[in-house]
Design a protein with these regions (language model features):
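RNase H-like, Mg2+-dependent phosphodiesterase core
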Residues: 1-76, 83-232
Length: 232
């Protein structure tokens, strides 16, 4: 008895690139529609996995390229969340990642589904050499303005990293310069380009969202668990 379509589908769904190549050659003469469809699905899956692996590798390699001639530079990435909400603080995340292991699906937090953000944030915190999230309350922002608030939040987050025993050689900031430190390097749209900035964007988002959910327990009428303090 020949191999059933269901069995072939299962093998193809679990195959890596090397095994797929073997199966594809073995099935070249199999004209069953289910087999042809399964081959096409597996090929698309493997291509998507290869594309994601390349994207992730580029985030880490681009980050390394910003470190000049020091291949062992310690890099901290920073990003903020919570600009312009109706309620809740500004949050700035600071993350120092090791070169390995690389964190699957790491990306700008806005490009990541909420459930995936939770998983990625947990993995970032597990493998990070150091991490911190610093909050600035709305009253401080009202009194001092956003630029001063960002400067305080970013500098406080870096200080917390250093107090944890990790001294960064390079400080990567997403967006415009803040002139915090001579180690500062600014990367426009860095949360989609640099691994540590992406990690900071995800962790700060997850931590702030969790804070707003706790606020919702005290102020249920504002629905903070759903809106996280934003108007829409």
């Amino acid at each position: 008895m020949g191999v059933t379509v269901a069995e072939i589908k299962k093998r193809l769904s679990e195959a890596d690139a090397e095994e797929f190549a073997v199966l594809e050659r073995a099935l070249v003469a199999d004209e069953r529609k289910g087999v042809r469809n399964a081959l096409a699905v597996a090929k698309r899956r493997l291509q998507a996995e290869a594309d994601e692996e390349a994207r992730l590798a580029s985030m880490y390699s681009f980050e390394r390229s910003l470190c000049g001639e020091n291949p062992h530079a310690v890099v901290v990435g920073l990003d903020e969340v919570g600009r312009g909400p109706l309620a809740g603080p500004l949050a700035v995340g600071a993350i120092v990642l090791p070169a390995d292991p690389k964190i699957a699906c790491l990306n700008d937090s806005k490009q990541v589904k909420p459930a995936d953000r939770e998983r990625i944030a947990a993995e970032v915190k597990r493998v990070a050499l150091a991490w911190d999230v610093h909050y600035i309350e709305p009253s401080y922002i009202d009194d001092h303005g956003m630029t001063a608030s960002l400067r305080l939040a970013f500098s406080s987050a870096v200080k917390a990293i250093e107090q944890a025993g990790v001294r960064p050689d390079v400080i990567l900031l997403d967006g415009n310069p803040l002139h915090l430190d001579p180690r500062e390097v600014n990367v426009v749209k860095g949360d989609g380009k640099c691994a540590s900035i992406a990690a900071a964007s995800i962790v700060s988002k997850v931590e702030r969202d969790a804070l707003m959910c706790r606020y919702a327990e005290s102020y249920p009428e504002y629905h903070f668990a759903e809106n996280k303090g934003y108007a829409s």
